[in-house]
């Protein structure tokens, strides 16, 4: 039984932390819940096993499962969790496409995408960029630039910007 529990912790640790894909999310969850990392990884592993296991699940589906799991923890605010997970995706995955569980419809988004593409000179061989409007701070957006990632973390740089400033940059 103890060996099985350690295996569940190991699997959650590998997917959530060692992969580098959920580091901001983990920092948010640990800060909001007060859980120790070991306890969180054990809970995540046990929860995943109760859902039928996660061995052959893709990253988007795993993200959706962790969204559901983390949201159910005491102290977690869905908007803050969504923002942390969205920033993790922008940091770690070129392209910046959010899974359905994190995507939010916002009429300003199309305009902001045009603005960041224009700023990057994408049509002239420029840098690919992505933008996400924060749910917990609607006047702020995060812009990712997919030129060069950090050689140590593998993360792409993010910039926190004012939505109004970004919208006005088109004019």
PLM feature spans:
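Radical SAM enzyme core and accessory elements
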Residues: 12-171
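Acidic/histidine-rich catalytic neighborhood
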Residues: 1
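Conserved, mostly hydrophobic/aromatic
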Residues: 6
């Amino acid at each position: 039984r103890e060996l099985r529990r350690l295996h569940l912790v190991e699997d959650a640790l590998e997917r959530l932390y060692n992969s580098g894909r959920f580091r901001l999310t983990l920092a948010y969850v640990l800060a909001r819940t007060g859980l120790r990392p070991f306890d969180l990884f054990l809970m995540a592993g046990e929860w995943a096993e109760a859902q039928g296991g996660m061995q052959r699940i893709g990253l988007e589906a795993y993200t959706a499962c962790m969204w559901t799991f983390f949201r159910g923890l005491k102290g977690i605010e869905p908007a803050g969790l969504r923002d942390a997970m969205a920033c993790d995706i922008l940091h770690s995955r070129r392209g910046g496409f959010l899974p359905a569980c994190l995507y939010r419809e916002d009429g300003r988004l199309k305009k902001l995408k045009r603005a960041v593409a224009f700023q990057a000179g994408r049509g002239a061989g420029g840098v690919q960029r992505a933008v996400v409007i924060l749910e917990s701070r609607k006047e702020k957006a995060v812009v990712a630039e997919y030129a060069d990632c950090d050689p140590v973390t593998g993360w792409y740089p993010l910039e926190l910007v004012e939505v109004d400033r970004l919208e006005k940059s088109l004019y």
